[in-house]
Amino acid sequence: MKYSIASMKVTLFFYFLCAKNIASLKYTKSNLSFLYNGCDNINSGGVNAHRNKTTVQTKNKHSKLKILSLNEKQDEELHYELNPENTEKVLNLIRPKLQIDNGDVELVDIKGNDLYIRLLGNCITCSSNSVTVSQVIKKTLKMYIRGPGNKEPNVIIINFDEINEENILNCLSDLKPYFDFLKIKLVIKEMINNKENINNSVMLVFKNIENEDKEVNIPHNIKTEITGRLKQNFPTLTVNFEN
């Protein structure tokens, strides 16, 4: 009898213990489910917020691009007719910076779509500076001026672009101290200049200052330097050397 009562007590004890553990597991599972769903909602909210932020940034980016494109288009459409008055207006945009260094620029002539410009003052005494100034002037005039048929003008800087003896020697003036040191001089023996700017050529010869009949040998790198400088100013010019 005692044995039966003891067995019943043990059975009841294990029954309540299992019931308690099952309830605890259910509660834990419920909590875990809540935590999982909560984290999922938070992550979803974060992803959605990130997507919304990205969308706004993309819209702003496209908006900026549209504004930039519109401004560029407006600048491209701002053109003046090719005539002396409008050319002077555009040159006035450049003059203040040139005049700071005692330089200037002037309109020489307009023939059809050809625009002839001359550099003045310090603009032509420094060869490296004159090349830069020429490029700026050409770019600015082509940006704002349009000739017949809405074409960009053919800007000709007569100090450099016209092929003649004076301009060729001016282009090489920086090398004169070197020639003086070697006691030689550079002479233009022959020059061909076509108005069509084709088959233009120049024949150069080096002569000894003290004795012109004396043979002169010039290093190849000096000839290369001379050719490079002339081709930079006169792209259509073929440079030849007699000696």
Curated annotation (Swiss-Prot):
Query: Molecular function (GO) terms listed?
Result: 4 iron, 4 sulfur cluster binding; iron ion binding
Q: Which SUPFAM superfamilies match?
A: Fe-S cluster assembly (FSCA) domain-like
The pathway this protein participates in, as annotated, is: Cofactor biosynthesis; iron-sulfur cluster biosynthesis
Localization, UniProt: Plastid, Apicoplast
GO-annotated cellular components: apicoplast; mitochondrion
Q: What is its main location?
A: plastid
Keywords (alphabetical) are: 4Fe-4S, Apicoplast, Iron, Iron-sulfur, Metal-binding, Plastid
The protein's job, in short, is: Binds and transfers [4Fe-4S] iron-sulfur clusters to target proteins.
Q: Kindly provide the name given to this protein in its UniProt entry.
A: NifU-like scaffold protein
Which organism is this protein's natural source?
Answer: Plasmodium berghei (strain Anka)
